[in-house]
Swiss-Prot record:
Domain PUA: residue ranges: 278-356
Family: Belongs to the glutamate 5-kinase family.
Name of the protein: Glutamate 5-kinase
Phylogenetic lineage: Bacteria, Bacillati, Cyanobacteriota, Cyanophyceae, Synechococcales
Highest taxon in the source lineage: Bacteria
Job of this protein: Catalyzes the transfer of a phosphate group to glutamate to form L-glutamate 5-phosphate.
GO molecular function: ATP binding; glutamate 5-kinase activity; RNA binding
EC annotation from Swiss-Prot or TrEMBL: 2.7.2.11
Native organism: Synechococcus sp. (strain ATCC 27144 / PCC 6301 / SAUG 1402/1) (Anacystis nidulans)
Gene that this polypeptide is encoded by: proB
Pathway: Amino-acid biosynthesis; L-proline biosynthesis; L-glutamate 5-semialdehyde from L-glutamate: step 1/2
SUPFAM superfamilies: Carbamate kinase-like, PUA domain-like
Binding-site residues, ATP: 11, 171-172, 213-219
Record-linked NCBIfam families: proB (TIGR01027)
């Protein structure tokens, strides 16, 4: 039995869902995954499935050979494919007596605090009802600047949202390697990662752009988001879904990313990962030190430069003078006001703006370290 109804998020990508030799879904892989998820449910786990494949299924249904490049066409094709994909899942899960639900999300659903809370409550109700939520990005209505961009990131944000204990990223390789094993015979497997800084040399590339900017790069980003939310993350082979059962039984399969100790509350996790920054504040060394080491709020005096056009209460990146992000937070002034008061002492703000505002630019309660 699962300890205390643990929650798992399982993400499967298009490469694992589709047949590499001919168009269409890899039904044997999907059926195997469905069977494993049903076993996990019987063991007491709550399971969320994040499934790609809507655009690919839509292309097959419409007889299109290539993935569309135009956004509007891709969104239309996703609408065609999503229904067929869900029908496949529903048929397979129904055979095993497991109810499912479709949950389509956009980044905007997580960027607004009330909608974020509503999404959390919906997932909790589905778990109470014994339902497996199947999640995908709502491609048909998502605007480019508010897209998750990939389902790896979406799955990590969902894992953080539902306070999962595990995130499984099912892919077309069996684990993470020091280079692309399909291109480099000297690539070495990586079995466990205690800190993502250990992988900086891999993330920097050097083995060809396909490996550095493709699917594995997004999985490392997802692992960072999830582990910061204390979610243990595993990359493993998608065509062997039975690996999930073996991993939960303690077998060292795939690449494990150890969770970081929980240091922030749910609201700060939302600020760190749910929001999309609309601006950037460049800070002097004193402000950087005060925020990183002292846990202080950001004052106007520490701001050297401002980038972007944003409103009060928008999310912004806080960066050192090299442009390296050190934190994120909710700003108390809009970009026009900040241009006037940057570098000033807090008691000068009312004289400059002509009205009394907040003493802090970003209060420490609305700030989270990167």
């Amino acid at each position: 039995m699962a300890p205390m109804s643990e929650t798992l998020v399982v993400k499967i990508g298009t490469s694992s869902l589709t047949n590499p030799h001919h168009p269409g879904l890899a039904l044997s892989t999907i059926a195997g995954l469905v069977e494993v998820i049903c076993q996990l449910r019987r063991q007491g786990y709550n399971v969320v499935l994040v499934s790609s494949g809507a655009v690919g299924v839509g292309c097959t249904r419409l007889g299109l050979r290539d993935r569309p490049s135009r956004i509007a066409q891709r969104q239309a094709i996703a609408a065609v494919g999503q229904g067929r994909l869900m029908r496949t899942y529903d048929d397979l899960f129904t055979t095993l007596g497991q109810p499912i639900a479709q949950v389509l999300l956009t980044r905007g659903d997580l960027a607004q605090r009330q909608r974020y809370i509503n999404a959390y409550q919906t997932f909790q109700e589905l778990f109470e009802l014994g339902v497996v939520p199947i999640v995908n990005e709502n491609d048909t209505v998502a605007v480019e600047e508010l897209k998750f961009g990939d389902n790896d990131t979406l799955s990590a944000l969902v894992a953080s949202l539902v306070e999962a204990q595990w995130l499984f990223l099912l892919t077309d390789v069996d684990r993470l390697y020091t280079a692309d094993p399909r291109q480099d015979p000297n690539a070495k497997p990586i079995t466990i990662v205690h800190d993502l800084s250990e992988l900086e040399s891999i993330q920097a590339g050097g083995q060809g752009s396909r490996w550095g900017t493709g699917g594995m790069a997004t999985k490392l980003t997802a692992a960072k988001i999830a582990t910061q939310a204390s979610v243990r993350t595993v990359i493993t082979q998608g065509r062997s879904p039975e690996n999930l059962l073996k991993i939960l039984a303690g077998e060292a399969i795939g690449t494990w990313f150890e969770p970081q100790p929980e240091t922030v509350n749910a609201r700060k996790r939302w600020i760190a990962h749910g929001l999309v920054p609309t601006g950037k504040l460049l800070l002097d060394a004193g402000a950087v030190q005060a925020i990183q080491a002292g846990g202080k709020s950001l004052l106007a005096a520490g701001i050297q430069a401002i980038e972007g056009d944003f409103e009060a209460q928008d999310a912004v990146q806080l960066c050192d003078l090299n442009g390296t992000e050190i934190a994120r937070g909710l700003v108390n002034y809009d970009s026009h006001e900040l241009q006037q008061i940057r570098g000033c002492q807090s008691d000068q703000i009312v004289q400059i703006l002509g009205y009394e505002g907040a003493e802090t630019i970003v209060h420490r309660d609305n700030l989270v370290l990167s």
